[in-house]
């Protein structure tokens, strides 16, 4: 490129059109030297046809000349000048002033030669969407490799280079260009031209591919018409355009209709496949139901059941809106049964059956889901089928066993009527469930004897022993081996070992840097206990040592800690990172499992069994986990818990937790919905006697089961933020 730009620096006298220029110059000189010149005007026009330019004038000036890109300006006497520089918008050269100063006519009686049409309309087949701003004034085509002169005009590089070799003036304004090297690339124009070409190619591509090959020629003509002036279209052209547009419209409508039918067909096929899968599933479930019904009928023949009383309300299946369709004839009275013939049967059987049917109706969807999840998990041999059916029968029996919650006794943790806060934070039974301890924000631990509380006819109960701490108490835990050994944690981060019957302190641990939320004794190792704190540490303590024996870095505030009931080495704790962490104490560097699923901080983590953990969070959910699986087995919803510690306890089958609507909620571990609830009465103090019951912000804050050695556990104790403690029984 540099070599081509530097090659040649010829002047105007050596241009390819020097002969034509000299003839015009001589004619002008002769006219100016005549004393009385005739009235003659010189006009030059370059006609673009076949690459030949001709100049004509009166008096025989000029003949056939070589085609030139730019002719130099010729000056004559009288200030007249003839210029054949091609304009931006015209194919013809502008006529110059002739003798006598006339610049527009050849004489008073001469005819005017009409100017040609503008560029784009003057070119044949110029349907391209050209812009005059991008047309080279020399070659009348789209600029290729735009270069700019000092005067600011842009041309094709080849065109301006060749023009300047012939003449050192700008073809647009006759500005003198001293050196051919004084050309500069116009990057902006090049970029705009490139975009213009891309738009044109996209437009051409769409039009070329929108019709079939049979109509390609007609659409090519249609494209040509789009680039022409509207005034040049006649009626035949317009009719043809309308015909093409109508054809295109019909084609698009047909394609649209075909697409709609295709979508409809796909929807119908997917719906049919889903329904077939559902039908297959229903058929499998029906076969399982028929099999189990026969098995239960065979088992019923081995017993002599008490006949049903006709006065007992029959079980009514939920409506189809509850996703349960049950044949009503299955629950109709057997033939020959009458109320009079059965009135002498056991009344307890009738009442029990009626209450269980009521609970079955209320929770039919959950029970149905539980049944099929149990039975359809693995369909194998008869022994496996029998065990699955027995498993569901046990689940159904436990779910329908209890109908209500009955209060047995009421206690008060509040010290006086004017005490503003009496929140009970923890309740725990001792090893033999003979005594229970209550602790909370009043900084006191009160120990009561269970039998005394239950047997007293009065509502005022006094503790067997009372211990006072230096700070608010967050948690307490009884030793499973030493009946009198009790541990407590408080808001100062202190862990204290007490003699629960004498009230004496045996150990004080003060290694936590922040508030300690939880403490728990190891059920298998009576000397080991653990505590969790806001300092993101879980510390392990030994009752015969003054310092901690190990520490686990949790990287988040620890809200609860609990040992496994079946292993001395396994520990679970919940954190503010929304997770439950499960550790083996033989390797405290990393957890065995991290259970993720809660949306907020985990406030409690309790073992339901040696393999199952239930966790509570301030996202108003309980979640059941298996220690060997990272996913949640079941979520329990119904209670409200968004900011407070509301308590959590389990006896192996049932889970109890508090709620921020001042109620106690009970769940069965096999079903997600609430089993039973118990509402605490709002006890107003002297200062709150004018406040409405709905305005209270009381919540159940602690709960504990009374687990008997034989495994039966239908008694629990719950307390709320007012300091009211209820001993409750499931009936």
Swiss-Prot record:
Activity regulation (record text): TRIB1 competes with substrates for RFWD2 binding.
InterPro entries in alphabetical order: COP1, WD40/YVTN_repeat-like_dom_sf, WD40_repeat_CS, WD40_repeat_dom_sf, WD40_rpt, Znf_RING, Znf_RING/FYVE/PHD, Znf_RING_CS
UniProtKB keywords: Coiled coil, Cytoplasm, Metal-binding, Nucleus, Repeat, Transferase, Ubl conjugation, Ubl conjugation pathway, WD repeat, Zinc, Zinc-finger
Molecular-function GO terms, alphabetical: ubiquitin protein ligase activity; ubiquitin-protein transferase activity; zinc ion binding
Cited SUPFAM superfamilies: RING/U-box (SSF57850), WD40 repeat-like (SSF50978)
GO cellular component, one term: nucleoplasm
EC class name: transferase
Motif Nuclear export signal, residue numbers: 235-245
Residues in WD repeats: 419-458, 468-508, 511-551, 553-593, 597-635, 638-677, 691-729
Positions in coiled-coil regions: 233-301
Protein origin, superkingdom: Eukaryota
Pathway noted in the entry: Protein modification; protein ubiquitination
Effect after changing residue 156 to S: Loss of MTA1 ubiquitination and degradation
Quaternary structure (record): Homodimer. Homodimerization is mediated by the coiled coil domain. Component of the DCX DET1-COP1 ubiquitin ligase complex at least composed of RBX1, DET1, DDB1, CUL4A and COP1. Isoform 2 does not interact with CUL4A but still binds to RBX1, suggesting that the interaction may be mediated by another cullin protein. Isoform 1 and isoform 2 interact with CUL5 but not with CUL1, CUL2 not CUL3. Interacts with bZIP transcription factors JUN, JUNB and JUND but not with FOS, ATF2 nor XBP1. Interacts with p53 (TP53).
Name of protein: E3 ubiquitin-protein ligase COP1
Organism: Homo sapiens
Lineage, broadest ranks: Eukaryota, Metazoa, Chordata, Craniata, Vertebrata
């Amino acid at each position: 490129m540099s070599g081509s730009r530097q090659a040649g620096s010829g002047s105007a006298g050596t241009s390819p059109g020097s002969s034509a220029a000299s003839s015009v110059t001589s004619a002008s000189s002769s006219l100016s030297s005549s004393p009385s010149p005739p009235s003659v005007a010189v006009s030059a026009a370059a006609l673009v046809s076949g690459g030949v330019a001709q100049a004509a004038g009166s008096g025989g000036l000029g003949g056939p000349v070589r085609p030139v890109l730019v002719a130099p300006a010729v000056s004559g006497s009288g200030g007249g000048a003839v210029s054949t520089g091609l304009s931006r918008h015209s194919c013809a050269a502008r006529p110059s002033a002739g003798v006598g100063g006339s610049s527009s006519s050849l004489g008073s009686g001469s005819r005017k030669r009409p100017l040609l049409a503008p560029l784009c309309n003057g070119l044949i087949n110029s349907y391209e969407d050209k812009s005059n701003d991008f047309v080279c004034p020399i070659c009348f085509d789209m600029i290729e490799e735009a270069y700019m002169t000092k005067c600011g005009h842009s041309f094709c590089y080849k065109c301006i280079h060749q023009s300047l070799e012939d003449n050192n003036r700008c073809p647009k304004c006759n500005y003198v260009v001293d050196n051919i090297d004084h050309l500069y690339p116009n990057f902006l124009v090049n970029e705009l031209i490139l975009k213009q070409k891309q738009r044109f190619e996209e437009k051409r591509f769409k039009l070329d591919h929108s019709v079939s090959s049979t109509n390609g020629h007609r659409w090519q003509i249609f494209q040509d018409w789009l680039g022409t002036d509207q005034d040049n279209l006649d009626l035949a052209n317009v009719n043809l355009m309308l015909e093409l547009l109508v054809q295109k419209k019909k084609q698009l409508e047909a394609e649209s209709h075909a697409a709609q039918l295709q979508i409809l067909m796909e929807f119908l096929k997917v719906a049919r496949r889903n329904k077939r899968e559902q039908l297959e599933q229903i058929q499998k479930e029906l076969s399982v139901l028929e099999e189990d019904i026969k098995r239960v009928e065979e088992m019923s023949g081995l017993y002599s059941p008490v006949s049903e009383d006709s006065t007992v309300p029959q079980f009514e299946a939920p409506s189809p809106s509850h996703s349960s369709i049950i044949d009503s004839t299955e629950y109709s009275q057997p033939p020959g049964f009458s109320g009079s013939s059965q009135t002498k049967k056991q009344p307890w059987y009738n009442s029990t059956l009626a209450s269980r049917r009521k609970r079955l109706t209320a929770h039919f969807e959950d029970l149905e889901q539980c049944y099929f999840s149990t039975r359809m998990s693995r369909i194998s041999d008869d022994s496996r089928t029998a065990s699955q059916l027995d498993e569901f029968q046990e689940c159904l029996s436990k779910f329908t066993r209890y109908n209500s919650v009955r209060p047995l006794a009421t206690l008060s943790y509040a010290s006086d009527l004017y005490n503003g806060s009496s929140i009970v934070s923890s309740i725990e039974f001792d090893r033999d469930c003979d005594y229970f301890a209550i602790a909370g924000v009043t900084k006191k631990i009160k120990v009561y004897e269970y039998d005394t509380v239950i047997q007293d006819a009065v509502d005022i109960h006094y503790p067997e022993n009372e211990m006072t701490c230096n700070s608010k108490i967050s948690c307490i835990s009884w030793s499973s081996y030493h009946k009198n050994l009790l541990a407590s944690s408080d808001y100062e981060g202190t862990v204290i070992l007490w003699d629960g019957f004498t009230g004496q302190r045996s150990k004080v641990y003060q290694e936590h840097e922040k508030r300690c939320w939880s403490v728990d004794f190891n059920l298998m190792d009576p000397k080991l206990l653990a505590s969790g704190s806001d300092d993101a540490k879980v510390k392990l303590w030994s009752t015969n040592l003054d310092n901690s024996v190990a520490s686990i870095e949790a990287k988040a505030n620890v809200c609860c800690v609990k040992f496994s009931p079946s292993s001395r080495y396994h520990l679970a704790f919940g954190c503010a990172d929304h997770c439950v962490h499960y550790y083996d104490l033989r390797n405290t560097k990393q957890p065995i499992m991290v259970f993720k699923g809660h949306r907020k901080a985990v406030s409690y983590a309790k073992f339901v069994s040696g393999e199952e953990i239930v966790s509570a969070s301030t996202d108003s959910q309980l979640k059941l986990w298996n220690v060997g699986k990272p996913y949640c087995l079941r979520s329990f919803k119904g209670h409200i818990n968004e900011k407070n510690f509301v308590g959590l306890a389990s006896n192996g089958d049932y889970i109890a937790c508090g709620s921020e609507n001042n109620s106690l909620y009970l769940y069965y571990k096999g079903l997600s919905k609430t089993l039973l609830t118990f509402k605490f009465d709002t006890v107003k103090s002297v200062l709150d006697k004018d406040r409405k019951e709905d305005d209270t912000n009381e919540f159940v804050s602690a709960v504990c089961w009374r687990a008997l050695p034989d495994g039966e556990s239908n008694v629990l104790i719950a307390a709320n933020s007012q300091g009211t403690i209820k001993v409750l029984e499931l009936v």
